[in-house]
């Protein structure tokens, strides 16, 4: 509950931190747009969670942006993902146990390009929480 409203508020990033904590993740690589990374919102919301966020190097971040804008948003099904995959591998090399897909273009990218890395989709975490908050039930996967 937020102080300024009288209804429950589902906070996507905090819910993501809680989900990672349930899975005993202590180090996660953050894949997101430049603006999201630079804003520090994930770091702020993850404070006190015990989860260390690992962000891409500037070169790797450029590859994330390239995939997002020149691949997914441009609708290029034959986009070369090697730069992005190098960025992802860099995060795992730095100790990430999973990836946070902190941009709504990234889950479709994983599907479009057959990317197979351990990850969490904050939008899906939020959707599940919304269903449960509304009294619904989730299907077993």
Regions found by a protein language model. Name each.
Residues 1-141:
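Non-catalytic structural scaffold of enzyme domains
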